[in-house]
Every structure is written in C-alpha cells, then in structure tokens.
C-alpha cells in the first residue's frame, strides 16, 4: 500500500543560515545602539524609558536568534565584535547630539530591519512556518519602534515651535 507524500517546499539551508545570521547580527547591533543611547540618557529620563521599552523588545529578539543559532546549527557573523563597538558608539553618539538625533537613528535602523524581515518572509518555505511567524512578529515590533521614533521626533519638533 502506497502512502501519499505531502509536497511541501523546504527552505534551502544556505538561505536559512543567511537569514538567521543576518537577523542575529541586526538584532545584536540594535541592542547595542539602544545600550549606547541609554548610557547617555539614563533609564529614568522620559526618553530613557521609551528607549528601554524598545531595548527590552530587542533583547527578546536577540534571545530568540541566539536560540535559533544553536537549534539550526548556524554560526554567527564573525563581525559581532565590530557590531558591539560600532552599535554602542552609534547609539551614544546620536544620543549625545540630542533626542531628535537618537530618534532619527532609531527610525532609520528600524526601517531597514523591518524591510529585511518583510523580504525574508517571502524566502521561507512551508518547513519554516514557525520562523516565519516569529519574523512577522518581530517585523511588527520593529515597525512599532520606527513609529515611536517618528512620534518622539515630531513631539520634540512641535515643542520647539511653540
């Protein structure tokens, strides 16, 4: 007796590895940017609390990608030491210029990460439904951060106009 096999598409291992490696690096860089901004603004300032909220979500993202690196046997990028220093420096540097600059950095970074997530969902096949769902949730978080950055910048501009 023959059993019917499901015709389910599988994601190419090299594509899967690339997605996880790139996303892990991006989330790591984002956590370091927020660490740099918080180092300047502090956790207790109004902007610091806003940044901490976004940083907490980014930490959830990096934790998940750390799990996926092990689960899917993917090596992280060799550039993590660079992301560590460059991310913190970018965050601290933009924060030193001011809240508006820090939020402009957030808007730009989160826009790029959100676009990557949208594109990656199209590359994942049926065998990676869970990862696709995770990436869709993270994309939503990144777009929220993008919108927070715009809202804070707009509020900051309006305060200076009056």
What is each stretch, according to the model?
Residues 23-26, 30, 85-144:
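Acidic/histidine-rich alpha-helical segments that form the ligand environment
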Residues 155-162:
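Conserved small/polar residues in nucleotide/adenosyl-binding loops
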Residues 12-24:
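Active-site flanking loop/helix segments enriched in acidic
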Residues 6-14, 30-52, 71-74, 113-129:
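Helix-loop segments that flank and shape redox-cofactor active sites
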Residues 64-66, 148-153:
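Amphipathic alpha-helical coiled-coil segments
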Residues 47-82:
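Conserved alpha-helical segments that form or flank metal/cofactor-binding pockets of metalloenzymes
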């Amino acid at each position: 007796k023959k059993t019917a096999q499901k015709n389910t598409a599988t994601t190419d291992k090299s594509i899967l590895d690339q997605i996880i490696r790139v996303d892990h690096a991006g989330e790591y860089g984002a956590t370091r940017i927020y660490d740099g901004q918080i180092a300047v603004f502090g956790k207790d300032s109004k902007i610091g609390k806003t940044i901490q909220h976004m940083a907490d979500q980014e930490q959830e993202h990096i934790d998940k990608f750390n799990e996926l690196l092990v689960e899917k046997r993917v090596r992280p990028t060799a550039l993590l030491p660079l992301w560590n220093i460059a991310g913190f420096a970018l965050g601290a540097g933009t924060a030193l210029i001011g809240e508006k600059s820090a939020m402009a950095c957030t808007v730009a970074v989160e826009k790029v990460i959100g676009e990557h997530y949208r594109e990656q969902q199209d590359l994942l096949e049926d065998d990676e439904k869970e990862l696709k769902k995770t990436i869709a949730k993270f994309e939503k978080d990144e777009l929220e951060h993008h919108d927070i950055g715009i809202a804070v910048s707009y509020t900051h501009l309006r305060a200076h106009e009056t």
